[in-house]
Amino acid sequence: MTENYKHTSVLLDEAVNGLNIRPDGIYIDGTFGRGGHSRLILSQLGAEGRLLAIDRDPQAIAVAKTIDDPRFSFVHGPFSALADYVSERDLTGKIDGILLDLGVSSPQLDDAERGFSFMRDGPLDMRMDPTRGQSAAEWLLTAEEADIAWVIKTFGEERFGKRIARGIVERNRIEPMTRTKELAEVVTAATPVKDKFKHPATRTFQAVRIWVNSELEEIELALKSSLGVLAPGGRLSIISFHSLEDRIVKRFMREQSRGPQVPAGLPMTEDQLRKLGGRYLRVLGKMMPGEEEVAENPRARSSVLRIAERTNA
């Protein structure tokens, strides 16, 4: 990282308020980033409170080291493994709240060397953790055209996915792409109809980033783990930034709040119904950023905060 980035967390107060912080509670900030949410949580905890922060971005490690607080601990890794981190600390079923701020952060987008943005030329990387897995350039060079098209259509909701995939494969045959600018140029050239409100490469960059980082799978794993990690009354406070993320969160909260779906007229005793499982979550609602926050931070426009509470089931 070549410079110090100031990062304003979207829906900062609302997301932390959604945790309903208890002074002696135990909380998880699953997406530490630059520490905005963690610092606010710590400010509301008493001497007996604890906060475990998680992030797979190596740049978050240096930021975490600046928080000299005995109540605070940090794990470098994916939030999908939160159940393991909690189990190692003998805290399973004792967590009072989990906060997740999904997707790519502004500092990651603004750092050209990370390769997340088509607005800044840099290495075609896009990995949240550059020490693990394939970079975007490596995947695009080795993947089949049909697979690239599927990823762009599925995770970018891009209607010209096949044309763009063909352009990527043809470009890589001539000379392998290594820069974000090169990918943006290929996508732009392969897009026959341009959206005047959106750069042609927006959806493709989103799709490749999601695929390279297994972002949606990470979310699903973390959500499933949360049920066993949270104490009764523990909160889930989750910020999504695009419809694919929000769809997963919304569906999970809805399904876990409905309880077992039994066909009408099926004769079952109360004991049999209990064995099927109960309503594990109570949905508390959703929030969107206000006009003032969007004006100050345009990237907040598409964000959605959803909050749910673990039941006694």
Curated annotation (Swiss-Prot):
Record InterPro entries: RsmH, SAM-dep_MeTrfase_MraW_recog, SAM-dependent_MTases_sf
Compartment annotation: Cytoplasm
Swiss-Prot/TrEMBL keywords: Cytoplasm, Methyltransferase, rRNA processing, S-adenosyl-L-methionine, Transferase
Cellular-component GO terms for this entry: cytoplasm
Residues that bind S-adenosyl-L-methionine: 35-37, 55, 79, 101, 108
Molecular function, one GO term: rRNA (cytosine-N4-)-methyltransferase activity
EC code(s) of this entry: 2.1.1.199
Recorded catalytic activity of this chain's protein: cytidine(1402) in 16S rRNA + S-adenosyl-L-methionine = N(4)-methylcytidine(1402) in 16S rRNA + S-adenosyl-L-homocysteine + H(+)
Pfam families in UniProt: Methyltransf_5
Keyword Transport: no
GO BP term, pick one: rRNA base methylation
Membrane-spanning residues: none
Keyword Cytoplasm applies: yes
Family: Belongs to the methyltransferase superfamily. RsmH family.
Function: Specifically methylates the N4 position of cytidine in position 1402 (C1402) of 16S rRNA.
HAMAP family linked to this entry: 16SrRNA_methyltr_H
Protein name: Ribosomal RNA small subunit methyltransferase H
Organism: Enterobacter sp. (strain 638)
Name of the coding gene: rsmH
